[in-house]
C-alpha cells in the first residue's frame, strides 16, 4: 500500500488495456491511499476504443469513497503489436493531430470542475470490457512469445524499463518471466531492434521517440514509452497521477 498526498481533485491518466484500465493500475489505485482526494477524473488513451471501462472506473471511485467525475478517451496511435497493426509515422502523426479537439474538451471539463460526458456504452462495449477482458489477460497477456535475435548486445535496457521486473539477463541475453503486462516497452526501446514478439519488431512502432507539443493549452503529448513511470504532480489545485505502462500515453501536466 502506498500513500500519495493529493489535492481534492485527482486526474488519473492511463493507457487502455483490453478495454479497461490496466489491471496493474486498478490494483495500485485500489491499494493506494490518496490523502486529501475528494473527486477523480479518469483519462484513458487507446488505439480505438475503451469499451465500457467507465463502469469499472466508477466502481473504483466508489471503492475509494471519491466522487466519480467521469471517464474520457483519447485515441492515440496503436502500439499493441501483439494483436493489432501499428500505423506508419505519417498516419500516427495524423491521429495525434485529430485528437486535439477531444483533448481540449477534456481539459475544459477538468478546469471547470465538470463531469466528463458519458462515453458510449452499447452491448459491444459491455461485452469487451466485461467478458473479454479477463479472457484476454488469461489467454493473451503472456511473455512466452517474446524472443531476441543474436544481434542483442546485452545492454539491459529492457531489464531496466520493465515495470514488473519481469526480464532478467542470462548470458547477456534477456529472458522473460511469467509476470508480464504486455506494455511492449522492451520492444519499443530496444536500441538494436532485437526484441521480437511473434515476428513483430520495433520498426513496427514508427512513432517511437516523437513528441507533439502544443502551447495554446496546458497539454503535453508524450509518445515515448517509459516502463513504470508514475508521476504525482499538483498543479493549480489539481493532482495528476500519471501511470505510464505503454506507448503512446497522454499526459496532462498543467
What residues fall within each predicted segment?
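FMN-binding flavodoxin-like domain, especially the glycine-rich phosphate-binding loop
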Residues: 1, 6-14, 18-135, 139, ...
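Short low-complexity, flexible loop/linker segments enriched in glycine and/or proline
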Residues: 4, 84-86, 183-187, 205, ...
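Conserved short-loop catalytic and cofactor-binding motifs
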Residues: 13, 45, 91, 149-150, ...
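Short, highly charged low-complexity linear segments
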Residues: 75-78, 160-172, 214-224
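A mid-sequence, solvent-exposed acidic-amphipathic segment
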Residues: 123-156, 160-161
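Iron-sulfur cluster-binding cysteine motifs and their immediate structural context
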Residues: 148, 153-181, 185-202
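Long, positively charged, glycine-interspersed low-complexity recognition regions
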Residues: 193-231, 254
Amino acid at each position: 500500500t502506498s500513500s500519495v498526498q493529493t489535492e481534492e481533485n485527482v486526474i488519473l491518466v492511463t493507457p487502455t488495456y483490453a478495454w479497461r484500465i490496466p489491471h496493474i493500475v486498478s490494483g495500485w489505485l485500489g491499494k493506494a491511499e490518496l490523502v486529501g482526494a475528494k473527486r477523480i477524473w479518469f483519462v484513458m488513451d487507446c488505439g480505438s476504443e475503451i469499451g465500457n471501462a467507465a463502469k469499472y472506473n466508477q466502481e473504483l471511485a466508489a471503492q475509494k469513497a471519491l466522487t466519480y467525475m467521469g471517464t474520457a478517451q483519447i485515441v492515440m496511435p496503436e502500439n499493441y503489436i501483439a494483436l493489432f497493426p501499428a500505423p506508419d509515422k505519417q498516419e500516427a502523426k495524423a491521429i495525434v493531430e485529430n485528437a486535439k479537439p477531444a483533448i481540449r474538451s477534456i481539459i475544459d471539463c477538468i478546469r471547470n470542475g465538470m463531469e466528463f460526458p458519458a462515453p458510449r456504452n452499447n452491448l459491444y462495449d459491455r461485452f469487451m470490457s466485461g467478458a473479454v477482458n479477463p479472457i484476454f489477460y488469461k489467454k493473451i497477456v503472456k511473455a512466452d512469445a517474446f524472443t531476441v535475435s543474436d544481434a542483442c548486445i546485452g545492454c539491459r535496457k529492457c531489464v531496466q524499463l520493465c515495470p514488473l521486473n519481469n526480464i532478467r539477463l542470462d548470458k547477456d541475453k534477456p529472458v522473460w518471466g511469467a509476470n508480464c503486462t504486455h506494455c511492449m516497452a522492451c520492444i519499443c526501446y530496444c536500441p538494436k531492434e532485437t526484441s521480437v514478439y511473434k515476428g513483430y519488431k520495433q520498426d513496427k512502432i514508427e512513432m517511437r521517440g516523437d513528441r507533439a507539443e502544443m502551447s495554446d493549452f496546458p497539454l503535453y503529448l508524450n509518445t515515448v514509452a517509459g516502463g513504470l513511470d508514475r508521476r504525482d504532480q499538483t498543479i493549480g489545485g489539481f493532482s495528476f497521477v500519471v501511470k505510464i505502462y505503454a506507448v503512446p500515453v497522454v499526459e496532462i501536466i498543467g
